[in-house]
Every structure is written in C-alpha cells, then in structure tokens.
Design a protein with these regions (language model features):
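Generic structural signal for well-ordered alpha-helices
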Residues: 54, 58, 81-85, 121-128, ...
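Conserved, mostly hydrophobic/aromatic
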Residues: 61, 142, 162
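C-terminal domain-boundary segment and adjacent tail
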Residues: 33, 174, 239, 243-313
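C-terminal segment of N-terminal export signals and the immediately downstream linker at the start
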Residues: 24-38
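Metal-dependent polysaccharide deacetylase catalytic core of the NodB/CE4 family, i.e.
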Residues: 38, 64-153, 171-180, 196-219, ...
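N-terminal export signals
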Residues: 2, 8-28
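Active-site-adjacent pocket scaffolds in enzyme catalytic domains
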Residues: 77, 146-259
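Active-site-adjacent substrate/metal-binding segments within catalytic domains
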Residues: 41-51
Length: 313
C-alpha cells in the first residue's frame, strides 16, 4: 500500500471530516493514486443580463487563475459580439455553444417540447457558427437549453445533426432520474450505442443554481428524488446568502473527490449568479474550496481531450 504523506492526511481530513470517515476517504485517495478529480467552472450564458455578470465573473477567474467554459446562446452573443470577444477571448476560457436561441432539442418535462427537426438544425448550426464567427476559433462543444434527464440517448437524428455540424462533445445530461434535481455525479460516456462513438457526453452536476433561489419564479415544484442521493444538498428552503449556496456546492465537490469521479461541474447561469450575489462571494468561496481539495481545474474541451484520447495529459 502506498504510504500517505502528512499533507495528504490533512487534505483527507478536510474532505471527509474527522473520525472513522477519514480512514475510508484516505483509502479512496490511496487507491486512486495520482489520478485527480477535475473541476470545471461552466456558465450557461443565455440572457441580456449575462454580460454585466460575466464582467464580474471574469475578474474572479483571473484572480484565481481558474479556467472556465462559457456556453453562449447565439442570439445573446450576436447582441454584443465585440464586448463578449473582448471579455472572454482569453487563454483561460473555452467558448462553446448553448444553441442559437435556447429552443428545445428534445422534450423536457419542465421546459417544454422539442422544436421541429428543421428548427433543431438551425439551433445547432447557427449557434456554433456564431461562436466561431465572433471568437475566430473552433467551437467543439454544445450544451442544449435546459438539458435532459437521459442526455441524447435514443435521439439518433439529433446526434446526426450534431455530428454533421462538427460538434465533438455535448453536455446535455443535466438532470437526475425522472427530471429530478440534483443531477447525479455522472462520468463521461460516448454515444456508441446510438451509432456515434466519436460524440462524447460530458454531463453537468448538482443543481441548476437559479432554481435554488427561485429565480425562474416557478415556486415550489416537484424536483427531488425520495430518498435523495444527496440529502445534505437539499436545503429546507430557497438559498438566502452566498454562504448557503456554497454549502450546497461543497457537497458535490467533496463527494466527487471521495468517490473518485473523473470530474465535477456545477450548473451555473451568470444572470442568476449576479442577481443573487453581485460581489461573487460564492465563486470565491467555491474556488477556494476547489483549491483546498486539490481538484484539477480544466475546461470541458480539455476534459473531452482526455476522455477521447486526443490529449493524454
């Protein structure tokens, strides 16, 4: 058995808590060796209010030297192309598409029915084209509006459009079973079963943070599983402070490390983050915790490079 250092012991104690759970978490860290869980900060950038929010978000990322993926709706990008280019054209950031106008690419129990196949083609192709035109770099990733509880499984026609557009990964698994939240800590997989082994699914995890604060004004809804796989991450009510939100985030960050997940990425929306926490205190708390745990920051594109075998680092 590999000898564990004092530094690893201290880190294990922080992650797992003091007591018997420390030993089980230490054993997990020993078993995984030098493999480190990756962390991806990702933002669904989808509304006019996102531009001001992204200015604040970028400041925090640069201060922490924290990479990020921005999934941008094409219409949102086309409304302020120069401003977004100046703000996000930075080595830390990947820019991917969030479709062109946030229309549904398959049915979603909460967000509505899918548009026609012709409309889905436009959403995929125009969204990718907008990113590549504004940023003059390849766009290899797509996150569909709202996401789904079964990703794009069983949707070969949509996957064919995605392949035709040149998209290499999608991030569409953003809900738990039966459209529940939080989304589970799922690892990447490809669509070989649908006939598309070169297209990878890179899920998102945890809550859609806007729902934690009732920013969609849905009010009380049927959202959680019972019994919950993450009871500590189901608050008694809507979050009231940045610290409340951070405590929820911490559950997923800690669990991903404890269970040896390949990565963890929470589902964030700039407009909602800024409305709730204009000083971005939650980001600072979360990024500090990521660094304390020793998670390995990256972008979705970098994760795709690893899981697809393109990048062996």
């Amino acid at each position: 058995m590999r000898r564990i250092s004092r530094r690893d012991f201290v880190r294990s104690s922080i992650v797992c808590g003091i007591g018997a759970s420390v030993m089980s978490c230490m054993a997990k860290i020993q078993n995984t060796g030098q493999k480190r869980t990756r962390y991806i900060a990702a933002y669904d950038t989808e509304s006019p209010a996102c531009l001001a929010a992204c200015r604040k978000i970028v400041e925090v990322h640069k201060r922490f030297e924290m990479p990020a993926t921005f999934f941008i709706v094409g219409k949102t990008l086309d409304a302020n192309p120069g401003e977004y280019r100046q703000l996000l054209d930075h080595p830390l950031f990947e820019i991917a598409t969030h479709t062109y106008s946030h229309q549904m690419l398959r049915d979603n129990d909460f967000c509505g029915s899918a548009v026609s196949m012709d409309e889905r083609r436009k959403e995929i192709f125009k969204g990718k084209e907008a990113v590549e035109r504004v940023f003059e770099r390849p766009c290899i990733g797509l996150r569909p509006g709202c996401g789904f509880d079964n990703a794009f499984r069983g949707e070969p026609k949509v996957l064919e459009l995605i392949r035709e557009a040149g998209i290499q990964y999608v991030s569409s698994l953003l809900w738990g079973p039966d459209y529940s939240l939080p989304a589970l800590l799922r690892d990447p997989f490809n669509y070989k079963a649908e006939g598309f082994p070169d297209i990878w699914e890179l899920p998102g995890h945890g809550w859609h943070e806007n729902l934690l604060k009732d920013h969609n004004q849905w009010g009380p809804r049927r959202l959680t599983l019972w019994p919950s796989p993450f009871p500590q991450a189901v608050p008694d009510g809507f979050c009231k402070t940045p610290e409340d939100e951070f405590e929820v985030n911490k559950v997923f960050l800690n669990r991903a490390l404890e269970t040896g997940n390949s990565f963890v990425s929470l589902i964030w929306h700039p407009w909602s983050l800024h409305k709730f926490d204009p000083d971005m205190q939650m980001l600072e708390l979360t990024f500090t915790h990521v660094q304390r745990l020793g998670l390995r920051p990256c972008t979705y594109a970098q994760l795709y490079g690893q899981v697809s075998g393109i990048d062996r680092s």
